[in-house]
Each structure stands twice: as C-alpha cells, then as structure tokens.
C-alpha cells in the first residue's frame, strides 16, 4: 500500500472511530440519565445523586467535543479524498461511504441542536 493510499485509509478510520464515539456518547448520556432518575426514585443518598449528576454532566460535555472532532476529521478526509491519485480505488469508495455517514451524523446533530441540550 502506497503512502498516499495509507494516508487515506488512516483518515477514513479516524472518521469511522469518531462516528462510533458520537454514538457511544448518546448511549452513555441515556444510561447516565437513567441512573440519575433511578437514584432519585429510590431515594438514595443526595451525595450519590450529585455524583451521578456529575457523571451525566461529563457525558454531556463529551458529545460536543466528539462532534468538533468529527467535523475536523471529515474536513481532513474530504480534502485528501479529492486527490486524483485515489480515483477508482476501493479505499476511496470506503472513504466516500464514511464521509456520507459523517455528514449525516453532523446534520442530525445540527438539526437537534436547539432541543438536545448538549451544546
């Protein structure tokens, strides 16, 4: 694999990983919200409830960070994938596939921006 193709593969894998990070951030947020509510419903110690709220806050802070990283990685991949050296390669096909997925994730998050409370 040439260095240029290797670079495309690396940047594609970065985008792929960050998409997973965004998905995991949503899962972590949902689970943390459930834990907080469960602690409240069970009348547990206020210190434990506050700790779980702190954990939830950290998960909420992770999502915008992942989205910024995804936007940056998407821009990097987009700029490198326009190189004519990659035309017709399976690596470019995969890069384009993940670019599309990344743009969908970013668009979905922007659409939810006013109501999701994460920004």
Curated annotation (Swiss-Prot):
Keyword rRNA-binding appears in the UniProt entry: no
Keywords: Chaperone, Cytoplasm, Cytoskeleton, Microtubule
Chief place of localization: cytoplasm
PANTHER family: TUBULIN-SPECIFIC CHAPERONE A
InterPro entries noted in UniProt: TBCA (IPR004226), TBCA_sf (IPR036126)
Assembly with partners or alone: Supercomplex made of cofactors A to E. Cofactors A and D function by capturing and stabilizing tubulin in a quasi-native conformation. Cofactor E binds to the cofactor D-tubulin complex; interaction with cofactor C then causes the release of tubulin polypeptides that are committed to the native state.
Entry similarity comment: Belongs to the TBCA family.
A GO CC annotation given for this chain: microtubule cytoskeleton
Location(s) in or outside the cell: Cytoplasm, Cytoskeleton
GO biological process, one term: tubulin complex assembly
Protein's name in the database: Tubulin-specific chaperone A
GO MF, one annotated term: tubulin binding
Purpose of the protein: Required for the maintenance of microtubule structures and cell polarity. Beta-tubulin-folding protein; may have a regulatory role in the tubulin-folding pathway.
Gene: alp31
């Amino acid at each position: 694999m040439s260095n240029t193709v290797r670079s495309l593969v690396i940047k594609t894998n970065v985008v792929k990983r960050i998409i997973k990070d965004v998905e995991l951030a949503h899962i972590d947020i949902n689970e943390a919200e459930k834990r907080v509510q469960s602690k409240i419903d069970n009348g547990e110690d206020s210190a434990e409830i506050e700790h779980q709220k702190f954990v939830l806050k950290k998960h909420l802070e992770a999502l915008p960070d992942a989205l910024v990283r995804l936007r940056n990685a998407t821009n990097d991949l987009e700029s490198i994938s326009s190189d004519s050296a990659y035309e017709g390669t399976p690596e470019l096909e995969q890069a384009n596939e993940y670019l599309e997925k990344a743009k969908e994730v970013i668009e979905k998050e922007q659409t939810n921006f006013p109501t999701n409370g994460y920004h």
